[in-house]
Amino acid sequence: QFGNICVRAGWTIEMVFHEGDSLAVRERAWKVIDLFVEAVGAEKLAIWWGMAPVAMASEKGKARIEKHKPSTLNNPKGFAMMFDLASGSPKPPDDWVENAQEFRLYCRIKNNEGIWLHDRHTTPGIGPSMSFIRMAFPAWWIMDQPPERNVGRLTTQIVELMQPYWAIAGWGVMPAVEERNIGPDGKGQQILYPYLQRFPGLNALGSLALMSHDFNNAMYSINWLSFVSDALLEKLGGREAVRKQIEASQYLSAGDVGNCLGVRAGDFPGLGDMEQGLTLPA
């Protein structure tokens, strides 16, 4: 209708965590990023790090990582770790056309000043802002993976490496690197709304939402796979109490994944299509 692609649907993984200004968290984050690049292939990716994108496998791309990565580890409290990886042309002819990439990794880990900005200066006691890594893979790639590299195994590896506060994974939509067209001025919300009504199995979260201080207290979004850390499970009676509730459910199953209790909502999900009367199971 508007001639622009503002998101692509695919397999999405969202991880939210604290202490983004610590060396331990930065080291875990780089392991996750390395796993993503290994799974996708550096030759398919471009990197955005504070300036115009360049091909990741190019000399400029390698130089950009070699320049910034040491700072994220040597000075984690003072140096933010905020960049994007995405497939497609590093220099598309128009920012507004065909700019939602198939493969995406969005890393937003602030420095100490950014994490505590609101708590120190505007809303004392609100706590730290969250750090997050989110990523997306196209459906065709998911279906092409052999059993030993299926998306469930990849998701489990990523959660085990990152040890998040909480995480979700399943079918969803991932914004383009240029997220401005998701807002009302860019017409992205108007485009998305009917599609999200038609396909009820798609999870949709804006990246800014993942920074919410509300996530200090609870996770407000779930997906087919949800991973909940002990800090949140304690608010619900503890890991074993929650596990017992899940085991009593007809649809849910649970298992330990790293520092989290992983919760699976039924069999591998299809996508309902309301126009064809294909609703999802309750």
Predicted regions and their residues:
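C-terminal interaction module
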Residues: 1-55, 176-282
